[in-house]
Amino acid sequence: MKLLALTVLLLTICGLEGALVRRQAEESNLQSLVSQYFQTVADYGKDLVEKAKGSELQTQAKAYFEKTQEELTPFFKKAGTDLLNFLSSFIDPKKQPATR
């Protein structure tokens, strides 16, 4: 009976030691994964800053801004005239806005 109890005790201790070693190994892997992630993010940020310093990104942004402005200017002009016509219909109800 004592031999059985000693065997169970020994197996329990070995199992706990194994679980502790696995847990420590998992924490180590998790820490290395997190540090690797932050290193990747930092490297990406450095690359992005280097690209932003270059004229290529600035040229692309300027071209995009100009294209957007060209496309939206007529839309906002029409919206402005429509808004003025709408508001003028409240101010002077006798005058009707020109219909198209």
Swiss-Prot record:
<dbReference type="GO" id="GO:0009395">
    <property type="term" value="P:phospholipid catabolic process"/>
</dbReference>
<comment type="function">
    <text>May stabilize HDL (high density lipoprotein) structure by its association with lipids, and affect the HDL metabolism. Has antimicrobial activity.</text>
</comment>
<dbReference type="GO" id="GO:0008203">
    <property type="term" value="P:cholesterol metabolic process"/>
</dbReference>
<dbReference type="GO" id="GO:0031210">
    <property type="term" value="F:phosphatidylcholine binding"/>
</dbReference>
<dbReference type="InterPro" id="IPR006801">
    <property type="entry name" value="ApoA-II"/>
</dbReference>
<comment type="subunit">
    <text>Monomer. Interacts with NAXE and NDRG1.</text>
</comment>
<keyword id="KW-0345">HDL</keyword>
<dbReference type="GO" id="GO:0010903">
    <property type="term" value="P:negative regulation of very-low-density lipoprotein particle remodeling"/>
</dbReference>
<dbReference type="GO" id="GO:0032757">
    <property type="term" value="P:positive regulation of interleukin-8 production"/>
</dbReference>
<dbReference type="GO" id="GO:0034375">
    <property type="term" value="P:high-density lipoprotein particle remodeling"/>
</dbReference>
<dbReference type="GO" id="GO:0034190">
    <property type="term" value="F:apolipoprotein receptor binding"/>
</dbReference>
<dbReference type="GO" id="GO:0055102">
    <property type="term" value="F:lipase inhibitor activity"/>
</dbReference>
<dbReference type="GO" id="GO:0033344">
    <property type="term" value="P:cholesterol efflux"/>
</dbReference>
<dbReference type="GO" id="GO:0050766">
    <property type="term" value="P:positive regulation of phagocytosis"/>
</dbReference>
<dbReference type="GO" id="GO:0042803">
    <property type="term" value="F:protein homodimerization activity"/>
</dbReference>
<dbReference type="GO" id="GO:0033700">
    <property type="term" value="P:phospholipid efflux"/>
</dbReference>
<keyword id="KW-0873">Pyrrolidone carboxylic acid</keyword>
<dbReference type="GO" id="GO:0042157">
    <property type="term" value="P:lipoprotein metabolic process"/>
</dbReference>
<dbReference type="GO" id="GO:0070653">
    <property type="term" value="F:high-density lipoprotein particle receptor binding"/>
</dbReference>
<dbReference type="GO" id="GO:0042742">
    <property type="term" value="P:defense response to bacterium"/>
</dbReference>
<keyword id="KW-0732">Signal</keyword>
<dbReference type="GO" id="GO:0034361">
    <property type="term" value="C:very-low-density lipoprotein particle"/>
</dbReference>
<feature type="signal peptide">
    <location>
        <begin position="1"/>
        <end position="18"/>
    </location>
</feature>
<dbReference type="GO" id="GO:0050995">
    <property type="term" value="P:negative regulation of lipid catabolic process"/>
</dbReference>
<dbReference type="InterPro" id="IPR036172">
    <property type="entry name" value="ApoA-II_sf"/>
</dbReference>
<dbReference type="GO" id="GO:0030301">
    <property type="term" value="P:cholesterol transport"/>
</dbReference>
<keyword id="KW-0044">Antibiotic</keyword>
<dbReference type="GO" id="GO:0120020">
    <property type="term" value="F:cholesterol transfer activity"/>
</dbReference>
<dbReference type="GO" id="GO:0031072">
    <property type="term" value="F:heat shock protein binding"/>
</dbReference>
<dbReference type="GO" id="GO:0034370">
    <property type="term" value="P:triglyceride-rich lipoprotein particle remodeling"/>
</dbReference>
<dbReference type="GO" id="GO:0048018">
    <property type="term" value="F:receptor ligand activity"/>
</dbReference>
<dbReference type="GO" id="GO:0034374">
    <property type="term" value="P:low-density lipoprotein particle remodeling"/>
</dbReference>
<dbReference type="GO" id="GO:0034384">
    <property type="term" value="P:high-density lipoprotein particle clearance"/>
</dbReference>
<dbReference type="GO" id="GO:0034366">
    <property type="term" value="C:spherical high-density lipoprotein particle"/>
</dbReference>
<dbReference type="GO" id="GO:0042627">
    <property type="term" value="C:chylomicron"/>
</dbReference>
<dbReference type="GO" id="GO:0071402">
    <property type="term" value="P:cellular response to lipoprotein particle stimulus"/>
</dbReference>
<keyword id="KW-0929">Antimicrobial</keyword>
<dbReference type="GO" id="GO:0046982">
    <property type="term" value="F:protein heterodimerization activity"/>
</dbReference>
<feature type="modified residue" description="Pyrrolidone carboxylic acid">
    <location>
        <position position="24"/>
    </location>
</feature>
<protein>
    <recommendedName>
        <fullName>Apolipoprotein A-II</fullName>
    </recommendedName>
</protein>
<dbReference type="GO" id="GO:0060621">
    <property type="term" value="P:negative regulation of cholesterol import"/>
</dbReference>
<keyword id="KW-0445">Lipid transport</keyword>
